[in-house]
Design a protein with these regions (language model features):
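C-terminal segment of classical bacterial N-terminal signal peptides
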Residues: 14-23
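Beta->alpha turn/N-cap motifs
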Residues: 58-62, 72, 77-86, 103, ...
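Periplasmic-binding protein-like
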Residues: 134-143, 241-261
Length: 268
């Protein structure tokens, strides 16, 4: 009986050590491939010099990285902007905070069918992200170009139900953000997040018919639970991601498609 108990404890220890959550000196960070995982890869060697084994787990959706960080499967994530996190925390009850602000990805409007938004036909099919904040963000961008009017042009949670004027009778199709680049041939235009535009070969500066201005509030952040956000390793990662060296890397690699916005946030 005692032998069985020892075996059971040993098995439990093995399972725990092999679990998805990181051990001391290791940070497991969930990230979308571009540009987030690429930026993390850039600081990986510097993190190792600080004694941190930075492990990057790639995701292609906007839900699982937050759930995994909240339940401890990840130490944190790097894929979302602050307004998205705020809404996610409210809607899903997760306990996540912003660790640092790293960069801004201007959202753009793309098309395989027209070269200018002036050529957008009556009744055109417009693809937008189906998550609340990015859907609202896309509608505010379209409103800024005069294509539609919305009830409150400052409300990041605006939905299609808040459209007050639609002179071109645009039809909106809400899809998962990651699917929008692949759906371009079936749409007249699509509003696409940069982290999904870049892997599809779309550059906001060269290919977008309309792009957000430099004053965008949608700063991309590293998020974690409060305890992990305050950890020495996470704070060291935040310093690396917000350094001038990383800002230089972002500027040179993405040529304005991604804009550095380095700032370490206060954890309460």
């Amino acid at each position: 009986m005692k032998k069985l108990s020892v075996l059971a404890l040993s098995a439990a220890a093995v399972l725990f050590s092999a679990s998805f959550a990181a051990n001391a000196g290791t940070l497991k960070i969930g990230a979308t491939p571009m540009p987030h995982a690429e930026i993390l890869e850039h600081v990986k060697a510097a993190a190792a010099e600080k004694g941190i084994d930075l492990q990057i787990i790639e995701f292609n959706d906007y839900v699982q990285p937050n759930l995994a960080a909240d339940d401890g499967e990840l130490d944190g994530n790097f894929f979302q902007h602050r307004p998205y996190l705020d809404v996610f925390v409210k809607d899903h009850g997760v306990n996540l905070v912003s660790v640092c602000s790293v960069h801004i990805e201007p959202m753009g409007v793309y098309s395989n069918k027209i070269k200018d938004l002036k050529d957008l036909k009556d009744g055109a099919l417009v693809g937008i992200p189906n998550d609340p904040t990015n859907g609202g963000r896309s509608l505010l961008l379209l409103a800024s170009a005069g294509l539609i009017k919305v009830a409150n042009p400052n409300d990041v949670t605006t939905t299609v139900l808040d459209i007050t004027e639609n002179p071109k009778n645009l039809e909106f199709r809400e899809l998962e953000a990651a699917q929008l680049p692949r759906a371009l041939d079936d749409l007249d235009v699509a509003v696409i997040n940069t982290n999904y535009a870049l892997p599809a070969g779309l550059n906001p500066n060269d290919d977008a018919l309309l792009i957000e201005g430099s004053e965008s509030p949608y700063v991309n952040i590293v998020a974690a639970t409060p305890d992990k956000a305050k950890s020495a390793d996470m704070q060291e990662l935040a310093k690396l991601l917000t350094s001038e060296e990383t800002a230089k890397f972002i500027r040179e690699k993405y040529q304005g498609a991604v804009v550095p916005a380095g700032q370490i946030d206060e954890i309460k």
